[in-house]
A protein has these predicted regions:
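Short beta-strand elements bearing conserved aromatic residues within extracellular beta-rich modules
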Residues: 50-52, 152-154, 189
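The feature marks proteins involved in alpha-glucan
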Residues: 1-37, 58-61, 66-146, 170-252, ...
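Short catalytic/ligand-binding loop motif for oxyanion handling, primarily in non-cytosolic enzymes
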Residues: 200-201, 259-261, 296-299, 344-348, ...
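Conserved alpha/beta catalytic core and glycan-binding cleft of carbohydrate-active enzymes
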Residues: 215, 402-404, 422-587, 592-593
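Substrate-binding/active-site clefts of carbohydrate-active enzymes
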Residues: 209-213, 232-245, 254-435
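Short acidic/polar active-site loop segments enriched in Thr and Asp
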Residues: 48, 150, 285-288, 404, ...
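Short proline/glycine-enriched turn/loop motifs at strand-loop junctions of beta-rich domains
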Residues: 43-49, 145-152
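Amphipathic alpha-helical
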Residues: 602-604
Length: 604
Protein backbone atom coordinates (compact mmCIF):
# COMPACT_ATOMS: atom_id res chain seq x y z
CA UNK A 1 0.00 0.00 0.00
CA UNK A 2 1.37 3.39 -0.97
CA UNK A 3 2.40 5.53 1.96
CA UNK A 4 1.46 9.16 2.37
CA UNK A 5 3.98 11.86 3.24
CA UNK A 6 2.73 11.89 6.82
CA UNK A 7 3.47 8.18 7.17
CA UNK A 8 7.18 8.88 6.83
CA UNK A 9 7.27 11.33 9.71
CA UNK A 10 9.19 10.11 12.78
CA UNK A 11 7.53 12.50 15.20
CA UNK A 12 9.54 11.66 18.35
CA UNK A 13 12.80 12.35 16.51
CA UNK A 14 11.34 15.46 14.86
CA UNK A 15 10.41 16.74 18.31
CA UNK A 16 13.97 16.04 19.48
CA UNK A 17 15.25 18.00 16.47
CA UNK A 18 13.06 20.97 17.31
CA UNK A 19 14.48 21.00 20.82
CA UNK A 20 18.05 20.61 19.45
CA UNK A 21 18.31 17.19 21.10
CA UNK A 22 18.33 14.85 18.10
CA UNK A 23 21.32 12.50 18.23
CA UNK A 24 21.16 11.37 14.58
CA UNK A 25 19.81 14.28 12.55
CA UNK A 26 20.16 12.41 9.26
CA UNK A 27 17.15 10.35 10.40
CA UNK A 28 14.94 13.42 9.97
CA UNK A 29 16.86 15.83 7.70
CA UNK A 30 18.11 15.71 4.14
CA UNK A 31 16.93 13.68 1.17
CA UNK A 32 16.55 9.91 1.26
CA UNK A 33 15.27 7.31 -1.18
CA UNK A 34 12.18 5.56 0.20
CA UNK A 35 9.71 2.99 -1.13
CA UNK A 36 7.50 5.61 -2.78
CA UNK A 37 10.17 7.95 -4.19
CA UNK A 38 12.51 10.58 -2.76
CA UNK A 39 11.71 12.05 0.65
CA UNK A 40 13.00 15.61 1.26
CA UNK A 41 13.09 16.98 4.83
CA UNK A 42 14.35 20.27 6.25
CA UNK A 43 13.91 22.50 9.28
CA UNK A 44 13.62 26.29 8.98
CA UNK A 45 11.85 27.58 12.12
CA UNK A 46 11.00 31.07 10.89
CA UNK A 47 10.29 30.27 7.24
CA UNK A 48 6.88 30.87 5.65
CA UNK A 49 7.51 28.68 2.64
CA UNK A 50 10.18 26.30 1.32
CA UNK A 51 10.53 25.11 -2.26
CA UNK A 52 12.85 22.49 -3.77
CA UNK A 53 14.73 23.56 -6.88
CA UNK A 54 15.93 20.43 -8.70
CA UNK A 55 18.83 20.81 -11.12
CA UNK A 56 17.71 20.46 -14.73
CA UNK A 57 14.03 21.09 -14.01
CA UNK A 58 12.24 24.38 -14.48
CA UNK A 59 9.47 23.74 -11.96
CA UNK A 60 10.02 23.85 -8.23
CA UNK A 61 8.47 21.53 -5.66
CA UNK A 62 6.53 23.14 -2.83
CA UNK A 63 7.31 21.51 0.51
CA UNK A 64 4.60 20.93 3.07
CA UNK A 65 4.93 22.55 6.48
CA UNK A 66 4.41 19.59 8.77
CA UNK A 67 4.08 21.47 12.08
CA UNK A 68 4.14 24.93 13.56
CA UNK A 69 7.82 24.73 14.49
CA UNK A 70 9.11 24.90 10.92
CA UNK A 71 9.61 21.31 9.82
CA UNK A 72 9.05 20.91 6.07
CA UNK A 73 8.84 17.77 3.94
CA UNK A 74 8.05 16.67 0.40
CA UNK A 75 7.77 13.35 -1.42
CA UNK A 76 8.63 13.21 -5.13
CA UNK A 77 8.80 10.46 -7.71
CA UNK A 78 12.15 8.91 -8.51
CA UNK A 79 14.74 6.44 -7.29
CA UNK A 80 17.93 8.53 -7.32
CA UNK A 81 18.49 11.60 -5.18
CA UNK A 82 18.96 14.58 -7.55
CA UNK A 83 21.09 17.68 -7.13
CA UNK A 84 18.90 20.30 -5.52
CA UNK A 85 18.71 23.42 -3.40
CA UNK A 86 16.12 24.91 -1.10
CA UNK A 87 14.45 28.24 -1.81
CA UNK A 88 13.47 29.52 1.61
CA UNK A 89 11.01 32.40 1.90
CA UNK A 90 10.76 34.58 5.00
CA UNK A 91 8.70 37.64 5.75
CA UNK A 92 11.87 39.70 5.35
CA UNK A 93 13.07 38.12 2.11
CA UNK A 94 14.20 34.86 0.57
CA UNK A 95 17.37 32.85 0.06
CA UNK A 96 18.62 29.83 -1.85
CA UNK A 97 20.65 27.30 0.10
CA UNK A 98 22.06 23.82 -0.36
CA UNK A 99 21.06 20.93 1.86
CA UNK A 100 24.05 20.25 4.11
CA UNK A 101 22.60 16.94 5.26
CA UNK A 102 22.90 15.31 1.84
CA UNK A 103 26.50 16.42 1.19
CA UNK A 104 29.32 13.88 1.24
CA UNK A 105 31.15 13.57 4.54
CA UNK A 106 34.24 15.72 5.11
CA UNK A 107 35.65 13.33 7.73
CA UNK A 108 36.02 10.00 5.96
CA UNK A 109 36.18 6.46 7.35
CA UNK A 110 39.98 6.37 7.31
CA UNK A 111 40.12 9.62 9.31
CA UNK A 112 37.82 8.05 11.88
CA UNK A 113 39.88 4.87 12.19
CA UNK A 114 43.20 6.72 12.47
CA UNK A 115 41.79 9.10 15.07
CA UNK A 116 40.23 6.29 17.10
CA UNK A 117 43.63 4.59 17.15
CA UNK A 118 45.42 7.81 18.10
CA UNK A 119 47.47 7.87 14.89
CA UNK A 120 46.12 10.84 12.90
CA UNK A 121 49.02 13.29 12.94
CA UNK A 122 47.08 15.84 10.88
CA UNK A 123 43.69 15.47 12.50
CA UNK A 124 43.57 19.28 12.64
CA UNK A 125 43.01 19.19 8.85
CA UNK A 126 39.64 17.54 9.48
CA UNK A 127 38.43 18.58 12.93
CA UNK A 128 37.83 22.26 13.59
CA UNK A 129 36.58 24.80 11.04
CA UNK A 130 37.70 24.61 7.40
CA UNK A 131 36.36 26.94 4.69
CA UNK A 132 35.50 25.13 1.48
CA UNK A 133 32.83 24.46 -1.11
CA UNK A 134 30.02 21.97 -1.61
CA UNK A 135 28.31 21.78 -5.01
CA UNK A 136 29.81 25.15 -5.90
CA UNK A 137 28.51 26.88 -2.77
CA UNK A 138 31.07 28.46 -0.44
CA UNK A 139 30.89 27.80 3.26
CA UNK A 140 32.74 26.13 6.12
CA UNK A 141 33.04 22.54 7.29
CA UNK A 142 32.80 22.17 11.07
CA UNK A 143 33.79 19.00 12.91
CA UNK A 144 34.19 18.21 16.61
CA UNK A 145 34.69 15.08 18.70
CA UNK A 146 31.96 14.67 21.35
CA UNK A 147 31.09 10.94 21.44
CA UNK A 148 28.86 11.01 24.52
CA UNK A 149 26.86 14.12 23.64
CA UNK A 150 23.13 13.80 23.00
CA UNK A 151 23.51 16.32 20.17
CA UNK A 152 25.85 19.06 18.97
CA UNK A 153 25.02 22.19 16.97
CA UNK A 154 27.28 24.84 15.52
CA UNK A 155 26.11 28.33 16.46
CA UNK A 156 27.24 31.86 15.75
CA UNK A 157 26.14 35.25 14.47
CA UNK A 158 25.29 33.53 11.17
CA UNK A 159 22.31 31.77 12.81
CA UNK A 160 21.67 34.13 15.72
CA UNK A 161 23.21 31.54 18.07
CA UNK A 162 20.17 29.32 17.60
CA UNK A 163 21.17 25.70 18.14
CA UNK A 164 18.08 24.43 16.31
CA UNK A 165 19.29 25.70 12.93
CA UNK A 166 22.53 23.79 12.35
CA UNK A 167 22.49 20.50 14.26
CA UNK A 168 25.53 18.46 13.26
CA UNK A 169 25.68 14.98 11.73
CA UNK A 170 27.02 12.28 14.01
CA UNK A 171 29.57 9.77 12.70
CA UNK A 172 30.22 6.32 14.19
CA UNK A 173 33.41 7.53 15.89
CA UNK A 174 31.54 10.17 17.88
CA UNK A 175 32.71 12.98 15.61
CA UNK A 176 30.03 15.50 14.68
CA UNK A 177 30.37 17.38 11.38
CA UNK A 178 28.40 19.80 9.22
CA UNK A 179 28.90 22.07 6.23
CA UNK A 180 27.38 25.50 6.83
CA UNK A 181 26.93 27.60 3.67
CA UNK A 182 27.91 31.26 3.52
CA UNK A 183 30.12 31.04 6.60
CA UNK A 184 33.78 31.94 6.10
CA UNK A 185 36.91 33.60 7.44
CA UNK A 186 36.19 35.99 10.28
CA UNK A 187 32.88 34.47 11.38
CA UNK A 188 32.69 33.63 15.08
CA UNK A 189 31.21 30.39 16.35
CA UNK A 190 30.92 27.89 19.18
CA UNK A 191 29.53 24.42 19.60
CA UNK A 192 26.27 24.07 21.50
CA UNK A 193 26.72 20.72 23.20
CA UNK A 194 23.76 18.91 24.75
CA UNK A 195 25.70 16.75 27.13
CA UNK A 196 25.29 13.26 28.47
CA UNK A 197 24.73 14.84 31.89
CA UNK A 198 21.65 16.73 30.68
CA UNK A 199 23.39 20.10 30.60
CA UNK A 200 23.72 22.34 27.56
CA UNK A 201 27.02 24.20 27.28
CA UNK A 202 28.65 26.47 24.72
CA UNK A 203 32.13 25.20 23.90
CA UNK A 204 34.97 26.85 22.01
CA UNK A 205 36.43 24.72 19.23
CA UNK A 206 39.28 22.52 20.57
CA UNK A 207 40.80 22.62 17.08
CA UNK A 208 39.97 26.25 16.29
CA UNK A 209 42.75 28.19 14.54
CA UNK A 210 41.79 31.61 15.93
CA UNK A 211 39.70 32.99 18.79
CA UNK A 212 38.18 36.18 20.07
CA UNK A 213 40.24 38.39 22.34
CA UNK A 214 39.50 37.78 25.99
CA UNK A 215 37.15 38.17 27.82
CA UNK A 216 35.14 37.05 24.75
CA UNK A 217 35.65 33.35 24.12
CA UNK A 218 34.18 32.32 20.77
CA UNK A 219 36.28 30.66 18.09
CA UNK A 220 36.82 32.36 14.72
CA UNK A 221 36.81 30.68 11.32
CA UNK A 222 40.25 31.31 9.85
CA UNK A 223 42.32 29.94 6.97
CA UNK A 224 46.00 29.52 7.85
CA UNK A 225 47.47 28.21 4.59
CA UNK A 226 47.91 31.46 2.69
CA UNK A 227 50.99 32.95 4.35
CA UNK A 228 54.07 33.03 2.08
CA UNK A 229 57.07 31.97 4.15
CA UNK A 230 60.53 33.40 3.44
CA UNK A 231 62.60 31.26 5.82
CA UNK A 232 63.66 28.41 3.53
CA UNK A 233 67.36 29.12 4.13
CA UNK A 234 66.88 28.93 7.90
CA UNK A 235 64.95 25.65 7.71
CA UNK A 236 67.62 24.13 5.47
CA UNK A 237 70.36 25.19 7.89
CA UNK A 238 68.38 23.93 10.89
CA UNK A 239 67.96 20.52 9.31
CA UNK A 240 71.73 20.22 8.93
CA UNK A 241 72.54 21.47 12.45
CA UNK A 242 73.14 19.24 15.46
CA UNK A 243 72.24 21.60 18.29
CA UNK A 244 73.73 19.25 20.85
CA UNK A 245 77.12 20.20 19.44
CA UNK A 246 76.42 23.88 18.77
CA UNK A 247 76.20 26.87 21.13
CA UNK A 248 72.70 27.71 22.30
CA UNK A 249 71.89 30.88 24.21
CA UNK A 250 68.14 31.24 24.62
CA UNK A 251 66.22 34.40 25.47
CA UNK A 252 63.05 33.44 27.35
CA UNK A 253 60.38 36.07 26.88
CA UNK A 254 56.77 36.94 27.57
CA UNK A 255 55.44 38.80 24.55
CA UNK A 256 52.95 40.89 26.50
CA UNK A 257 55.51 42.43 28.86
CA UNK A 258 58.73 42.49 26.85
CA UNK A 259 57.93 46.04 25.87
CA UNK A 260 54.71 48.01 26.30
CA UNK A 261 53.30 50.78 24.07
CA UNK A 262 53.07 54.22 25.65
CA UNK A 263 49.27 54.15 25.58
CA UNK A 264 48.99 50.73 27.21
CA UNK A 265 47.82 47.48 25.70
CA UNK A 266 50.14 45.28 23.67
CA UNK A 267 52.43 45.53 20.69
CA UNK A 268 51.42 43.31 17.77
CA UNK A 269 53.28 40.18 16.68
CA UNK A 270 54.67 42.14 13.74
CA UNK A 271 55.88 45.01 15.90
CA UNK A 272 57.40 42.58 18.39
CA UNK A 273 59.16 40.73 15.58
CA UNK A 274 61.27 43.77 14.73
CA UNK A 275 62.02 44.65 18.34
CA UNK A 276 62.85 41.07 19.36
CA UNK A 277 65.08 40.30 16.39
CA UNK A 278 67.05 43.52 16.78
CA UNK A 279 67.66 42.96 20.48
CA UNK A 280 68.53 39.27 20.23
CA UNK A 281 70.98 39.83 17.38
CA UNK A 282 72.64 42.65 19.29
CA UNK A 283 72.99 40.50 22.43
CA UNK A 284 74.13 37.33 20.68
CA UNK A 285 71.17 35.08 21.43
CA UNK A 286 70.68 32.08 19.16
CA UNK A 287 67.03 31.43 20.04
CA UNK A 288 64.02 32.91 21.78
CA UNK A 289 61.73 30.80 23.91
CA UNK A 290 58.22 32.19 24.08
CA UNK A 291 56.07 31.66 27.12
CA UNK A 292 52.84 30.10 25.81
CA UNK A 293 51.29 31.92 22.88
CA UNK A 294 48.37 29.48 22.63
CA UNK A 295 45.02 31.11 23.40
CA UNK A 296 44.29 31.49 27.10
CA UNK A 297 41.62 33.45 28.98
CA UNK A 298 43.64 34.69 31.96
CA UNK A 299 46.56 37.11 31.57
CA UNK A 300 47.83 36.21 35.03
CA UNK A 301 48.33 32.58 33.96
CA UNK A 302 51.07 33.84 31.57
CA UNK A 303 49.64 31.44 29.02
CA UNK A 304 50.08 28.25 31.03
CA UNK A 305 46.32 27.61 31.31
CA UNK A 306 45.49 27.03 27.67
CA UNK A 307 42.03 26.87 26.13
CA UNK A 308 42.82 27.16 22.41
CA UNK A 309 45.73 24.82 21.75
CA UNK A 310 45.63 25.40 17.99
CA UNK A 311 45.21 29.18 18.10
CA UNK A 312 47.94 31.77 18.69
CA UNK A 313 46.49 34.27 21.13
CA UNK A 314 44.59 37.12 19.53
CA UNK A 315 46.04 39.54 22.09
CA UNK A 316 48.81 40.36 19.64
CA UNK A 317 47.18 39.80 16.25
CA UNK A 318 46.15 37.16 13.75
CA UNK A 319 47.67 33.76 12.95
CA UNK A 320 49.40 35.33 9.94
CA UNK A 321 50.88 37.98 12.21
CA UNK A 322 52.40 35.27 14.40
CA UNK A 323 53.72 33.50 11.31
CA UNK A 324 55.39 36.77 10.39
CA UNK A 325 56.97 36.92 13.86
CA UNK A 326 58.55 33.48 13.44
CA UNK A 327 59.48 34.15 9.82
CA UNK A 328 61.18 37.45 10.64
CA UNK A 329 63.23 35.95 13.45
CA UNK A 330 64.29 33.08 11.21
CA UNK A 331 65.44 35.50 8.55
CA UNK A 332 67.45 37.25 11.26
CA UNK A 333 69.09 33.94 12.20
CA UNK A 334 67.15 33.50 15.46
CA UNK A 335 65.35 30.25 16.30
CA UNK A 336 61.92 30.20 17.93
CA UNK A 337 61.08 27.68 20.68
CA UNK A 338 57.53 27.55 22.05
CA UNK A 339 56.47 26.71 25.58
CA UNK A 340 53.84 23.98 25.31
CA UNK A 341 51.56 22.77 28.10
CA UNK A 342 50.34 19.16 27.76
CA UNK A 343 50.33 18.59 31.53
CA UNK A 344 47.00 20.18 32.47
CA UNK A 345 44.20 22.50 31.35
CA UNK A 346 41.82 24.93 33.08
CA UNK A 347 38.21 24.38 34.12
CA UNK A 348 36.69 27.30 32.18
CA UNK A 349 33.20 26.35 31.02
CA UNK A 350 33.96 26.98 27.34
CA UNK A 351 37.08 24.79 27.47
CA UNK A 352 37.78 21.06 27.36
CA UNK A 353 36.47 20.13 30.80
CA UNK A 354 33.40 17.81 30.69
CA UNK A 355 33.27 18.59 27.01
CA UNK A 356 30.36 16.33 26.07
CA UNK A 357 28.84 16.03 29.52
CA UNK A 358 31.44 13.46 30.54
CA UNK A 359 35.10 13.59 31.50
CA UNK A 360 36.18 13.27 27.88
CA UNK A 361 39.66 14.80 27.95
CA UNK A 362 40.28 14.32 31.68
CA UNK A 363 39.94 11.38 34.07
CA UNK A 364 36.62 10.73 35.80
CA UNK A 365 38.18 10.15 39.23
CA UNK A 366 39.43 13.43 40.71
CA UNK A 367 42.39 11.59 42.21
CA UNK A 368 43.60 11.07 38.66
CA UNK A 369 41.98 13.99 36.87
CA UNK A 370 42.79 17.09 38.95
CA UNK A 371 45.78 19.02 40.23
CA UNK A 372 44.57 20.12 43.69
CA UNK A 373 47.04 22.97 44.16
CA UNK A 374 46.72 24.34 40.59
CA UNK A 375 42.97 23.90 40.33
CA UNK A 376 43.34 22.45 36.84
CA UNK A 377 42.45 19.20 35.10
CA UNK A 378 44.84 16.43 34.00
CA UNK A 379 44.68 14.88 30.55
CA UNK A 380 43.77 11.22 30.17
CA UNK A 381 46.85 10.25 28.14
CA UNK A 382 45.64 6.66 27.86
CA UNK A 383 42.65 7.65 25.72
CA UNK A 384 43.89 7.45 22.10
CA UNK A 385 41.89 10.44 20.86
CA UNK A 386 43.18 12.64 23.70
CA UNK A 387 46.79 11.66 23.08
CA UNK A 388 46.16 12.25 19.36
CA UNK A 389 44.79 15.73 20.10
CA UNK A 390 47.97 16.68 21.94
CA UNK A 391 50.55 15.00 19.70
CA UNK A 392 48.94 16.41 16.56
CA UNK A 393 48.98 19.81 18.25
CA UNK A 394 52.71 19.60 18.96
CA UNK A 395 53.38 18.65 15.34
CA UNK A 396 50.99 21.41 14.21
CA UNK A 397 53.16 24.15 15.72
CA UNK A 398 56.28 22.66 14.18
CA UNK A 399 54.66 22.23 10.77
CA UNK A 400 52.27 25.15 10.35
CA UNK A 401 54.17 27.80 12.31
CA UNK A 402 57.74 26.62 11.63
CA UNK A 403 58.58 26.49 15.34
CA UNK A 404 62.10 25.18 15.98
CA UNK A 405 61.20 23.27 19.10
CA UNK A 406 58.88 22.83 22.05
CA UNK A 407 59.66 23.24 25.73
CA UNK A 408 57.26 21.02 27.67
CA UNK A 409 56.07 22.61 30.88
CA UNK A 410 55.69 20.73 34.17
CA UNK A 411 56.84 17.33 32.90
CA UNK A 412 57.33 16.07 36.46
CA UNK A 413 53.61 16.55 37.11
CA UNK A 414 52.93 14.26 34.16
CA UNK A 415 55.35 11.54 35.23
CA UNK A 416 54.22 11.17 38.85
CA UNK A 417 50.69 10.23 39.85
CA UNK A 418 51.24 11.72 43.30
CA UNK A 419 52.76 15.01 42.13
CA UNK A 420 51.59 17.75 44.49
CA UNK A 421 49.19 15.39 46.24
CA UNK A 422 48.82 14.03 49.75
CA UNK A 423 48.06 10.46 50.78
CA UNK A 424 44.57 9.53 49.65
CA UNK A 425 44.58 12.08 46.84
CA UNK A 426 46.04 9.81 44.17
CA UNK A 427 45.69 6.29 42.74
CA UNK A 428 48.65 3.98 42.19
CA UNK A 429 49.34 2.42 38.82
CA UNK A 430 48.70 -1.28 38.05
CA UNK A 431 52.01 -2.20 39.67
CA UNK A 432 51.36 -0.22 42.82
CA UNK A 433 53.80 2.55 41.94
CA UNK A 434 53.47 6.30 41.53
CA UNK A 435 54.63 6.45 37.92
CA UNK A 436 52.07 7.57 35.34
CA UNK A 437 52.61 4.78 32.81
CA UNK A 438 50.28 6.32 30.24
CA UNK A 439 52.05 9.69 30.40
CA UNK A 440 55.42 7.99 30.00
CA UNK A 441 54.28 6.26 26.82
CA UNK A 442 52.71 9.50 25.61
CA UNK A 443 56.00 11.39 26.00
CA UNK A 444 57.97 8.67 24.26
CA UNK A 445 55.55 8.61 21.37
CA UNK A 446 55.56 12.39 21.09
CA UNK A 447 59.35 12.61 21.05
CA UNK A 448 59.61 9.80 18.52
CA UNK A 449 57.19 11.65 16.24
CA UNK A 450 59.32 14.78 16.50
CA UNK A 451 62.50 12.85 15.78
CA UNK A 452 60.86 11.17 12.80
CA UNK A 453 60.50 14.58 11.17
CA UNK A 454 64.29 14.74 10.79
CA UNK A 455 64.15 18.50 10.34
CA UNK A 456 66.13 19.66 13.37
CA UNK A 457 63.10 20.30 15.60
CA UNK A 458 63.86 20.07 19.33
CA UNK A 459 61.98 18.89 22.39
CA UNK A 460 63.00 20.25 25.80
CA UNK A 461 61.75 19.09 29.19
CA UNK A 462 61.17 21.18 32.28
CA UNK A 463 61.54 18.20 34.61
CA UNK A 464 62.30 19.07 38.21
CA UNK A 465 63.08 15.65 39.69
CA UNK A 466 65.76 13.02 39.24
CA UNK A 467 63.71 10.92 36.82
CA UNK A 468 66.30 8.90 34.90
CA UNK A 469 67.06 9.13 31.18
CA UNK A 470 64.85 12.10 30.36
CA UNK A 471 67.12 12.74 27.38
CA UNK A 472 67.98 9.07 26.95
CA UNK A 473 67.28 7.08 23.81
CA UNK A 474 63.72 5.81 23.57
CA UNK A 475 64.98 2.41 22.41
CA UNK A 476 66.92 2.10 25.66
CA UNK A 477 64.05 3.14 27.91
CA UNK A 478 64.61 6.90 27.87
CA UNK A 479 61.94 9.55 27.30
CA UNK A 480 63.68 10.87 24.20
CA UNK A 481 63.91 14.61 24.92
CA UNK A 482 66.76 16.54 23.33
CA UNK A 483 67.45 18.65 26.42
CA UNK A 484 66.40 18.86 30.06
CA UNK A 485 66.33 21.97 32.21
CA UNK A 486 68.91 21.62 34.99
CA UNK A 487 66.77 22.71 37.92
CA UNK A 488 69.19 21.25 40.45
CA UNK A 489 72.04 23.44 39.21
CA UNK A 490 69.81 26.49 39.28
CA UNK A 491 68.48 25.91 42.80
CA UNK A 492 71.93 25.14 44.22
CA UNK A 493 73.51 28.18 42.64
CA UNK A 494 70.78 30.60 43.69
CA UNK A 495 70.96 29.29 47.26
CA UNK A 496 74.72 29.79 47.19
CA UNK A 497 74.87 33.22 45.59
CA UNK A 498 72.26 34.87 47.80
CA UNK A 499 74.47 34.11 50.81
CA UNK A 500 76.73 36.98 51.83
CA UNK A 501 80.31 36.21 50.69
CA UNK A 502 81.45 36.41 54.31
CA UNK A 503 79.39 33.31 55.09
CA UNK A 504 79.98 31.17 52.00
CA UNK A 505 82.79 29.19 53.58
CA UNK A 506 81.79 25.57 53.66
CA UNK A 507 79.12 26.05 50.98
CA UNK A 508 81.32 26.04 47.88
CA UNK A 509 80.30 22.48 47.14
CA UNK A 510 76.95 23.87 46.02
CA UNK A 511 78.56 25.29 42.89
CA UNK A 512 80.57 22.19 42.06
CA UNK A 513 78.09 19.42 42.87
CA UNK A 514 76.38 19.79 39.49
CA UNK A 515 79.45 18.33 37.79
CA UNK A 516 78.80 15.02 39.57
CA UNK A 517 75.70 14.42 37.41
CA UNK A 518 76.37 16.82 34.53
CA UNK A 519 76.79 14.13 31.88
CA UNK A 520 73.86 11.95 32.93
CA UNK A 521 71.56 14.07 30.72
CA UNK A 522 71.79 16.70 27.98
CA UNK A 523 71.32 19.63 30.32
CA UNK A 524 70.24 23.19 29.73
CA UNK A 525 71.17 25.76 32.39
CA UNK A 526 68.32 28.14 33.14
CA UNK A 527 67.51 31.29 35.03
CA UNK A 528 63.84 31.30 34.05
CA UNK A 529 60.77 33.40 34.72
CA UNK A 530 59.82 31.15 37.66
CA UNK A 531 62.74 32.54 39.66
CA UNK A 532 61.78 36.21 39.38
CA UNK A 533 58.09 36.17 40.38
CA UNK A 534 55.84 35.54 43.38
CA UNK A 535 57.97 37.48 45.86
CA UNK A 536 61.16 35.66 44.89
CA UNK A 537 62.67 38.93 43.70
CA UNK A 538 64.62 39.65 40.54
CA UNK A 539 68.08 38.21 39.96
CA UNK A 540 69.42 41.62 40.96
CA UNK A 541 67.52 41.50 44.26
CA UNK A 542 68.87 38.02 45.05
CA UNK A 543 72.44 39.32 45.10
CA UNK A 544 73.82 40.45 48.48
CA UNK A 545 75.50 43.78 49.10
CA UNK A 546 75.32 47.31 47.79
CA UNK A 547 73.84 48.15 44.35
CA UNK A 548 77.32 48.03 42.84
CA UNK A 549 78.01 44.67 44.51
CA UNK A 550 74.67 43.34 43.28
CA UNK A 551 75.56 44.20 39.69
CA UNK A 552 78.97 42.62 40.15
CA UNK A 553 77.27 39.51 41.53
CA UNK A 554 75.08 39.37 38.44
CA UNK A 555 78.05 39.57 36.11
CA UNK A 556 79.76 36.86 38.15
CA UNK A 557 76.63 34.67 37.96
CA UNK A 558 76.30 34.94 34.21
CA UNK A 559 80.00 34.36 33.77
CA UNK A 560 79.78 31.19 35.85
CA UNK A 561 76.74 30.12 33.84
CA UNK A 562 78.56 30.71 30.55
CA UNK A 563 81.58 28.68 31.67
CA UNK A 564 79.56 25.75 33.02
CA UNK A 565 78.78 22.93 30.55
CA UNK A 566 75.27 22.98 29.11
CA UNK A 567 73.08 25.14 26.90
CA UNK A 568 71.97 28.46 28.37
CA UNK A 569 68.58 30.11 28.93
CA UNK A 570 68.00 33.50 30.49
CA UNK A 571 64.68 35.19 31.16
CA UNK A 572 64.23 38.65 29.69
CA UNK A 573 65.42 41.62 31.71
CA UNK A 574 68.01 39.74 33.72
CA UNK A 575 70.72 40.32 31.12
CA UNK A 576 70.71 44.07 31.79
CA UNK A 577 70.08 43.87 35.53
CA UNK A 578 66.32 44.35 35.85
CA UNK A 579 65.85 45.62 39.39
CA UNK A 580 62.18 44.95 40.05
CA UNK A 581 60.49 41.57 40.10
CA UNK A 582 58.83 40.64 36.81
CA UNK A 583 55.10 41.16 36.32
CA UNK A 584 53.02 40.39 33.24
CA UNK A 585 51.21 43.69 33.82
CA UNK A 586 54.11 45.97 32.95
CA UNK A 587 57.04 46.17 30.58
CA UNK A 588 60.68 45.70 31.50
CA UNK A 589 62.66 48.58 33.01
CA UNK A 590 64.40 49.53 29.77
CA UNK A 591 65.00 52.98 31.24
CA UNK A 592 67.83 51.44 33.29
CA UNK A 593 69.92 51.25 30.13
CA UNK A 594 69.32 54.90 29.33
CA UNK A 595 69.97 55.95 32.94
CA UNK A 596 73.28 54.09 33.10
CA UNK A 597 72.08 52.00 36.04
CA UNK A 598 71.99 48.65 34.27
CA UNK A 599 74.53 45.89 34.48
CA UNK A 600 75.38 46.42 30.81
CA UNK A 601 76.46 49.99 31.55
CA UNK A 602 79.41 48.75 33.58
CA UNK A 603 78.32 50.54 36.74
CA UNK A 604 79.76 48.83 39.78
Amino acid sequence: MKKKLEDYMDWPKIEDLEYAECRNVEDVLGAVAVEDGILFRCFFPDADKVLIKIKGKSRTVIMKKMDNCGYFAALTAGKKIPEYTYQVQYKTGKMEIIDSYTADHYVDAMDEVMFANGEHDRIYDKLGAHPGQVAGYAGTWFAVWAPNAVSVSVVGDFNNWDGRLHPMRRLESGIYELFVPEVGDGDIYKYEVHGYDGKTVMKADPYGFYAEKRPASASIVWSIDEYEWQDADWLKKRKQTNWKKEPMVIYEMHLGSFKKPMGGGFYTYRELAEKTADYCKKMGYTHVELMPVMEHPLDASWGYQVIGYYAPTSRYGTPEDFMYFVDHLHQAGIGVILDWVPAHFPKDEHGLGRFDGTCLYEHLDKRQGEHPHWGTLIYNYGRPQVANYLIANALFWLEQYHADGLRLDAVASMLYLDYGKQDGEWIANMYGGNENLEAIEFLKKLNQKIKDRRDGSLSIAEESTAWPMVTGNIEEGGLGFDFKWNMGWMNDYLEYIKTDPLFRKGRHGMITFSMVYQYSENFMLVFSHDEVVHMKGSMYQKMPGTPAQKLAGLRQSFGYMAAHPGKKLLFMGQDFGQISEWSEERGLDWNLLADGKAMASGTG
